[in-house]
Amino acid sequence: MTHPGILFMRALSHLPLGAVRGLGTLLGRLLFVLARSRRRVALINLRLAYPQWSEAERVALARRNFVYFAQAFLDRSWLWHADPDRVRQRLRITGAVDDLTREGAVVMFAPHFYGMDAGGSAVMQQIDRPACTIYSTQPNPALDEWMQAGRQRFGDATLLSRTEGVKPIVRALREGKMLYLLPDMDLGPTEAVFVPFYGVPTATVPSLSRFAKLGHARVVPVVTRLTDFGYEVKVHPAWPDYPSADATADAALMNQRLQGYIDEMPEQYYWVHKRFKTRPPGEASFY
């Protein structure tokens, strides 16, 4: 993202939502044609996750997936630049909100659906409680500054650098901050365990249970869906059986429950990421 790109996003924030989404539809269709490497990744992921589908069904879902990807990206225009009242009107929090507001430390399990930034903004704008999330610095300084400002726009939000390690995160939890955690990516073999995800042994970092244990926190899933009015941010009830004494079993349970959330809206999950990239020793790459 360059400075002209950021100016474009600021200008886009003044358009009606339908116009922004329409541009996102066009951009997504274009990306599906031009971004061949990411299209290939998405289709491989879908073959692994949904082998029972026909190839035509997977291609059709991948097309919709690219549209949602582009729409969510352009939605950052109004999410990070529009009038706060207009943002609030487009973000609807539903479900077990009391599990976020009642006393005690909270780790929000926020899977990588395309609405993840909207979910974070909704929580910070509408839940009166400080929160933090883990942030990876972007190589482009202008993009990095823009993303940091956007993600800290509302409420008492703190971005913790991934390079700082565990201690600042645990300290924040023990100080009463909620943690908005997105642990469902392939970050390589370091600290990962191989547990099933759609029946495939998948490198999974057991950070959800780890932070819940160290921070004496309950785990509350927060799943965000793009809708016609903007976004629905659904707060699921806190998991009563999590974490356990077994970090590997916890990682497997997280993936199992994540599959349930994905199956409700597979077209909005982050399939363009190489989720199955890291393989057990001796296994060939899927990609």
Where in the sequence are the language-model features?
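Non-catalytic C-terminal accessory region of glycerolipid acyltransferases
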Residues: 34, 53, 59-63, 100-102, ...
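An N-terminal domain-start capping segment
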Residues: 14-17, 133-136, 178
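Membrane-anchoring hydrophobic helices of lipid-metabolizing enzymes
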Residues: 1-110, 114-115, 145-149
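A conditional alpha-helix N-cap/helix-loop micro-motif detector
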Residues: 89-93, 113, 140, 159-162, ...
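Generic structural signal for isolated residues within well-ordered alpha-helices
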Residues: 10, 45, 122, 149-150, ...
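Residue-level marker for well-ordered alpha-helical positions
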Residues: 40, 117-118, 144-145, 166-167, ...
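Catalytic core of membrane glycerolipid acyltransferases/transacylases, capturing the structured
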Residues: 103-163, 189-192, 196
